[in-house]
């Protein structure tokens, strides 16, 4: 069965219908009329659109003979995490959940990274950033401030898929201008609606999508961006003293997230060009991606995993820029005291205002 085509009014977002009396398209909600040919043009553009999705060229680098001789795989029985380290690795705890890890054998069976961004900041800087992150948090449990938890900070190379693509975009925005005035009887507000169009092409390079399921996507996106000018061809020597998370989300499985990020950025970029209005929102967008390819990279991240009353908390710091992020637990006892104090303060303030108003009436 054919799908039903629906036009939305750029003025009020209502569904436009054909008015047989005027032979025009008319919005039944705001009575705005449109010529049929105007909306027909949108149909013709949509007919000429390319498929919205494309086939990405995904990476497939292989290791040179003997290149992985000094690399070993370690696994965590608690969270399933799997990391890679060299002969010098001294870590004995999982960077994702803090539980013990065990050596499972010689590293094998994964793609060779194309690029790596070496660590720019050391463990001392990570500790300082963590202390800064904890500073001023009155509802934070005291255990989070103990030095032994800070010492669990670990340097991890996190796997990322980097996507390049061009985006051809046709977008229509609804924009408004509002003015207000008053007379002796009434206040007036007039809102004018405008339909604004933007067409163009944007190029995207190295749009990152992390390839680890053990780390929340929001956490990794929160410590972006990574400066790609520091990315260099991968060498195993950079793993010395650190561990590398072994990817468990393939490039193919990351394409959907990459497409969403590119489309969202395209809409935001074009929307920023629609200026001089009081409000702007996307009404309709047609974005086709082409020329897509992906690379495999390792990015430096300092991780701290700790627990509080059965809940695990993972903090992350960009090992290149120092950007820090992570959710904090709340001491429920301290929170209750804080709420009681706030309630008492508000009650006292309300009583004071009421007393002043009563006093003013007497005077």
Task: Enumerate the language-model features and the residues they cover.
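Short cysteine-rich clusters marking metal-coordination/redox-active sites
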Residues: 9-12, 27-30, 76-79, 94-97
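Intrinsically disordered, low-complexity segments
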Residues: 2-4, 35-71, 105-132
